[in-house]
């Protein structure tokens, strides 16, 4: 059996966000092969996410964040976010509370409009399509390319407007969806954003 070092376990855990016991088992079961262990964890993670998706997230907390442009002035931007989990035990953990704080600060900075793409009204998407189509024609794009250009821009609108599809402001390589999946894998529960509100005096 290949010798598994503490450094290997630590490195794989940092790369995947998986728990210590899962990381060790992945390395042992794959004879210390790093790439195979990563694939094993990815497959295991997918299975765990699928199982968690069927469970109910009936606990959690509401986190708030207030932003001041000047420490001497009252806050002009505020966020409330509802972060849900399955048990009050997880809701009380510092990791869960920190995740809620990170999400509230992300929402303040990134200004999403919806939690999921399914929440975007059809009329909003149709209005965006018309705007992008008119813009593409004004730009003189070839007629046969306009439909593809419009869909690409609509997809860009969705990614920028939907919280789960946005890149995390603290790490642009990770989406909020992936961040929640990592937290769910680490905490062993279904983690989801229920809803959020963002208030900005300057946009009122």
UniProtKB/Swiss-Prot annotation:
InterPro entries: EF-Ts_dimer_sf (IPR036402), Transl_elong_EFTs/EF1B (IPR001816), Transl_elong_EFTs/EF1B_dimer (IPR014039), Transl_elong_Ts_CS (IPR018101), UBA-like_sf (IPR009060). Its main location: cytoplasm. GO terms for molecular function: translation elongation factor activity. The keyword Chaperone does not apply. Residues 87-90 are annotated as: Involved in Mg(2+) ion dislocation from EF-Tu. Pfam families: EF_TS (PF00889). GO terms for cellular component: cytoplasm. It is found in: Cytoplasm. Belongs to the EF-Ts family. This is Elongation factor Ts. It comes from Frankia casuarinae (strain DSM 45818 / CECT 9043 / HFP020203 / CcI3). The gene is tsf.
